[in-house]
Regions:
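Cytosolic, long alpha-helical scaffolding segments
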Residues: 1-241
Length: 241
């Protein structure tokens, strides 16, 4: 906001450039994180170790971007004291990069575990179930990032609604996993399936982070904190605005 910046055009331009940079960097980080998750999922389902190994490299970049964006946001807060929309933008970016970093961590965990799996002991039908859950989560992660990029409240609300379905799908997946585990009498095979269940949990958590990003987007656009509000109530309140 230019009222914070004094009277010189030079300072105003510097401020605008700084605000544009943190938003651009956030979208860059989003793209890296989304690619990491897609690679981790493909590596897990298709036993592609090269993709799983690639995720570790991306995780380093994700962490670097998070630190860079965080530092730039704090510099703006310290030197420019932004208000109104700009302040809300910075708050949202700081929240979003935290969720993105955690998505990156979960993707890295999936990749690391998949490298240790013994695929000979895994029923292909189980991998299909896991793939469906993973693809559903991939879709809402993409849509949550897109809702932020487009500042789309409707798209963000759709992400939040869809996350509930993913939670149900995760529970169904876990029941299927447990039904396999109870039939096993080999410790190595049990450990194998426990690793798969950990991957499934990571996928479900990524869906939760996607939901968070969608909630942050609504706060950015509407100034409403909806973290403890139902989608139906949010729609009703927004219709009254």
């Amino acid at each position: 906001m230019k009222e914070n910046l004094g009277n010189t055009g030079h300072i105003s331009r510097s401020y605008d450039e700084a605000m544009n940079e943190i938003q651009s960097k956030t979208l860059e980080m989003s793209g890296v994180v989304e690619s990491s998750y897609v690679d981790a999922l493909r590596g897990l389902i298709n036993n592609e170790s090269s993709l799983s190994q690639k995720v570790a490299t991306n995780d380093f970049l994700v962490n670097k971007l998070e630190i860079d964006i965080d530092e730039k946001c704090n510099t703006i807060l310290a030197l420019q004291t932004p208000v109104a929309t700009d302040l809300r933008t910075i708050i949202v970016i700081l929240r979003i990069i935290t969720d993105l970093e955690r998505v990156g961590d979960e993707a890295e965990k999936i990749a690391r575990l998949s490298l240790k799996l013994n695929y000979e002991n895994i029923d292909p039908a189980l991998l299909k179930t896991l793939e469906h859950l993973g693809n559903s989560t991939s879709t809402i992660l993409h849509n949550s990032i897109d809702s932020y990029a487009r500042k789309s409240v409707d798209q963000a609300l759709e992400v939040i609604q869809t996350d509930k379905k993913i939670d149900l799908e995760f529970k169904s997946c876990m029941k299927e996993l447990i039904s396999y585990i109870v039939k096993l009498d080999d410790d190595k095979a049990v450990k194998n399936f426990l690793s798969i269940s950990t991957c499934a949990k990571s996928i479900e958590r990524i869906g939760d982070h996607a939901k968070n990003i969608a909630q942050h987007t609504i706060y950015l656009v509407k100034g409403k904190d909806i973290r403890h509000t139902s989608v139906e109530q949010v729609r009703s309140e927004l219709d009254q605005d």
